Amino acid sequence: MPDDKRAKPEKSKYPVNLLDTPFPMRGDLPKREPQWVKQWQDKQLYKKIRAARKGAKKFVLHDGPPYANGDIHIGHAVNKVLKDMIIKARGLTGLDAVYVPGWDCHGMPIEIQIEKKFGKGLPVQEVQAKARAYATEQIKRQMMDFERLGVLGDWDHPYLTMNYSNEADELRALGKIMEKGYVFRGLKPVNWCFDCGSALAEAEVEYKDKVDLSIDVGFPFAQADKLAHAFKVPFEQLDGKPGWIVIWTTTPWTIPSNQALNVHPEVEYALVETPRGYLILATERVEEQLKVYGLEGKVVATTTGAALSEIRFHHPLAKMDAGYDRLSPVYLGDYVTTDTGSGIVHSAPAYGVEDFQSCKAHGMADSDIISPVMGNGVYAGTLPLFGGLSIWDANPKIVEVLQASGNLFNSHKYTHSYMHCWRHKTPIIYRATSQWFAGMDVDPADENGKTGPTLRETALAGIDATEFFPAWGKQRLHNMIANRPDWTLSRQRQWGVPMAFFLHKETGALHPRTPQLLEEVARRVEQHGIEAWQTLDPAELLGDEASQYEKNRDTLDVWFDSGTTHWSVIRGSHRDDLYDPSADEADGRLADLYLEGSDQHRGWFHSSLLTASMLYGKPPYKALLTHGFTVDGEGRKMSKSIGNTVSPQDISNKMGAEIIRLWVASTDYSGELSISDEILKRVVEGYRRIRNTLRFLLSNLSDYDHARHALPASEWLEIDRYAVALTAQLQKEVLSHYEAYEFHPVVSKLQTFCSEDLGGFYLDVLKDRLYTTAPDSKARRAAQNALYHITQAMLHWMAPFLSFTAEEAWQIFAHGTEHTDTIFTSTYYAIPEVDDGADDLLQKWHTLREVRAEVTKQLEAVRVEGEIGSSLQAELTIQAGGPVLDALQSLGDDLRFVLLTSSAKVTHAPEAGDLLVTVTPSTHAKCERCWHYRADVGHNPDHPTLCGRCDSNLFGAGEHRSHA
């Protein structure tokens, strides 16, 4: 370190060692941080760090790509800062910690933006060109904001799912999983958004309250003879009598598509006689439902659900239009409950997963499934009574017609949690459409034709082999995989990677050379992007067969885009940076860590697991880390309508990005992360304490050169050895926390270290020695030795989260050393061993600090009484026994420096466990220089205002200390 000039106290002929530092008290973060960002960019800091770690073991944190649309929000900031802290913390261990940021670029939100800006109906190629340009601009904006947060990474070479190479490799991945037999086409109910005009992934569905019409509808008896047999009543009792099996639903719009009824095989059902006619209800629901219907009634017979199997009932709209003149059979279903409603469920197989499965299990052909709702949410014009109406507008009309038919038993408004599109915030439905799926329970075939475990089995085994932070994530993801349906891979969009299949015009069958054709298309996409599929003439690949085939128009689910980045990025576009062959050979898992918000258990974590399970038979990650969502100070979700959103850009501009980083680091990310003005004020205060501690350390090291002034630990004072031993103990804890991706304990312990261990004790004691002993005395240099080691360690602890501040301090602290340029090419500091008996030393000084705390209380009480001003005006007598007495006596006259008094005497206590403190105001004169009250003030007539110690330190051989 350079020798800085020592500041000269004004008008003092007896100077003390008050030094200065270019490290300012005020961080001025909003102004200085952008300068650091530019400096890091100019000197290509990330590249320098990678070069410094060349040949080291890699640590790969694979970036879950944010969507390239709109400005970043506080949730993005949390995510990127967490990743950055982990990369830096791992890098400081000496690992080659690699971070390639990425962006998710295809999909509906960008299509919506293009429609808003340019209108609907553009040719596909034009939509794709404009979408690509739009995404590029959004990425530039987001990248600037991420870099402003102090996030280091390969910003010059990010991965983009719209890069031609990534699009091409995605097609290759599709080809691989098709070869293994995972992909099939089928009719199934999928999440469908009318506004998107497309199927949705599970991760694109959110739930919120919706008010619907709840109705109880009767399906008239059609087979009285079979019912009489089932309930064991005379046929005459039912023949010709009005009767209904009653269902309850909150989706009246599905009634026109009803094709079956479901009962639970083991539930008891009752035949209930009412003035209106006979009703069939679950026995345990009879009393409640009759109240709802306003009917009196009595149970005349009961039977099990199993006995009702295959009995048929008239459609409730049959009397209103011949188009509904059909019978609905009863099918058994274990999923039927009696918690609410009638205990009977109506089944519209086109609009419910369980309905579909039940009807298919009973032999219903795809062609027999009634599906009148079109992709825009409007009934086909051919549907009797309701054709041309949107399903939501049709609900009251359907209720009206049911009322007229005499088959409506109740109707009222009902609020329930319902599926909505996460983009449009509008209600969605299940809708049976022909889609491409990845089968969860398909037995895949390897290259030798041998079948293996299903995708579900492989994925579940992979979860068991993955480490989760926090641990509860394992069960959450396990449950999702265990219960999920087949994955709908296809979408009906324009801005997406095409499912580049050739389908036979008559049969719809895939071309027999589909895997090879996908590779041919991928080569073209690699050169020209997905636009190549639009311009491709099938004859180029199919020759004379071209007239028999047509190009598939579906695109891949965007979760397949991001979910295959382990293939297209780690093994593909960024292979040189991210791929570690040794890790791949060891267990096939390509990334050390995936880190995202808790919603990604059903999103990116989920899709990545499924694609890797299909491609390699293993997860792509060794560990998953999940963080919570940001909420305001009252625990409410961020919402523009509430007005409680917090902009990371605003915080950076007003307080500094360092405050965001410290807030993230100091918060337990495993739960919700609360943020508010009040919370940020507390973070700022915590930052100031750390910064002030750093300023003190750097100031008092500004005339210290470790190469010239280093001393062996045996020549330090005892309190210095204690402080460094305490630092070493804390470093073990800090590094253990970092290893487990725990940041808030590090921040908490660092703040305690600064405020209590350093500011509240060690530095408080040290000031006298630093300021009053001779500048080059062994006592002062010993203190600086300790401060040097403490500062080295502390700056490295801070660097992952207080990156700007650590770098600023480091360039002052490490000036002229090997790693002056940046702290991030160095490693965690190897704190020297200070004492063979470090544990005993720590225990002894722990005891002394407890005594000091008691002494401080007593001094404060006397000060409040007005008997003393500062603690230096006091003289102490301490009575103690046992180990406490031994510890106190071992310090000799140095005890007074530890207790910050002018005198401290120790005697035996009357009882061994007693600690008695007597405070007496000093009667001696005050030394002008050190402010101690001593009997020897003025002993040298040449310096009548100095104590003997200061006289010796300034003009003589200097004082001797051995403990403090």
Curated annotation (Swiss-Prot):
Cofactor note: Binds 1 zinc ion per subunit.
Motif 'HIGH' region per UniProt: ranges: 66-76
Pfam families recorded: Anticodon_1 (PF08264), tRNA-synt_1 (PF00133), zf-FPG_IleRS (PF06827)
Compartment(s) where it occurs, according to its Swiss-Prot or TrEMBL record: Cytoplasm
Chain span(s) of sequence motif 'KMSKS' region: 637-641
Binding site for ATP: K640
Catalytic reactions on record: tRNA(Ile) + L-isoleucine + ATP = L-isoleucyl-tRNA(Ile) + AMP + diphosphate
Keyword Nucleus annotated: no
E.C. number: 6.1.1.5
Top EC category: ligase
Family: Belongs to the class-I aminoacyl-tRNA synthetase family. IleS type 1 subfamily.
Subunit structure: Monomer.
UniProt remark on domains: IleRS has two distinct active sites: one for aminoacylation and one for editing. The misactivated valine is translocated from the active site to the editing site, which sterically excludes the correctly activated isoleucine. The single editing site contains two valyl binding pockets, one specific for each substrate (Val-AMP or Val-tRNA(Ile)).
Name of the featured protein: Isoleucine--tRNA ligase
Species this chain originates from: Cupriavidus necator (strain ATCC 17699 / DSM 428 / KCTC 22496 / NCIMB 10442 / H16 / Stanier 337) (Ralstonia eutropha)
